[in-house]
């Protein structure tokens, strides 16, 4: 049965085109995916991301539990509200999910995990938590709204209780605080996102979500759908679980080495496989590619290199760049001469560093300059 967020009727009233996304009835756009993309890059847009799963972890040994569970090290989290992006691995080093973990207190951490992986994540986390006597609490009572873009933070801060605006204005990146709106709505305000733009991801009680969404609308923040969210995140060089990595792919094979902390004295699930792969080298690599010819890069297209064949993972037409961009997984080795098979024709590709776009501008080399 398709699930609906608390904002479903609101999306329909705004004229959204709804699609099935991982078992959820979600807005793909509200008229123009292109306009919504540019709105976020140039001003501010908001997304209903209530399909994401919030998981609260409680217990005296919750930090020790997360040191074991996650490939990145929660020992980096020492200030209340600080956050960390990390992968959660299986014993073979494959990525069960990528997630954000927030440090709330020594006996309370919060995770935000992907919607499509909810059931397997909760099962895995629950199984591992038993050894540490950690209580796992799924917060299905929450909704989540992401407000993203150069003017996103200012628009949200205008809606906060005046007593909280100074703290919200000073909030650093990858940090969160508990605050409230002018109307007294309790808000978990995180300076994070999935677009490459500044902004907030806001966790709030479901029963308050429609009112807060409408308050943002009244501020002039326009809604954006999952279509724009996908083109924005790929331009920003951000991964999509299930497309760019999965439980058969290690972080080293997904260009996520920066999320691995091989700190001394910490044995986390999957560590031994990662240590071996780091020493020997991964057999494949995730790279960013640009196609200068006309056309669109799509998931599953074959990519040819001097070292063998790979494939396109996430691919799209970049509204900011006016070119097709993609992630590709190809064999380890040279990536100087790349071609993609598009309907039987081999078309040249250029390998580039990602993100493709930062602060609304093409990164050096992406446009071929």
Swiss-Prot record:
Keyword Methyltransferase belongs to the record: no
EC number of this enzyme: 2.1.2.10
Leading EC class: transferase
SUPFAM superfamilies xrefs:
Aminomethyltransferase beta-barrel domain (SSF101790), Folate-binding domain (SSF103025)
Gene Ontology CC entries for this record: cytosol; glycine cleavage complex
NCBIfam families in the cross-refs: gcvT, PRK00389.1
Keywords recorded for this protein, A-Z: Aminotransferase, Transferase
In the record, biological process GO terms are: glycine decarboxylation via glycine cleavage system
Lineage, top-rank taxon, reads Bacteria
InterPro entries given in the database record: GCS_T (IPR006223), GCS_T_bac (IPR022903), GCST_C (IPR013977), GCV_T_N (IPR006222), GcvT/YgfZ/DmdA (IPR028896), GcvT/YgfZ_C (IPR029043), TrmE/GcvT_dom1 (IPR027266)
Q: What is the stated purpose of this protein?
A: The glycine cleavage system catalyzes the degradation of glycine.
What species was this sequence derived from?
A: Xanthomonas oryzae pv. oryzae (strain PXO99A)
HAMAP family linked to this entry: GcvT
Similarity comment: family membership: Belongs to the GcvT family.
> What is known about its subunit structure?
The glycine cleavage system is composed of four proteins: P, T, L and H.
Q: Which reaction does it catalyse?
A: N(6)-[(R)-S(8)-aminomethyldihydrolipoyl]-L-lysyl-[protein] + (6S)-5,6,7,8-tetrahydrofolate = N(6)-[(R)-dihydrolipoyl]-L-lysyl-[protein] + (6R)-5,10-methylene-5,6,7,8-tetrahydrofolate + NH4(+)
Name the UniProt record assigns to this protein: Aminomethyltransferase
User: Transferase as a keyword?
Assistant: yes
GO MF term list: aminomethyltransferase activity; transaminase activity
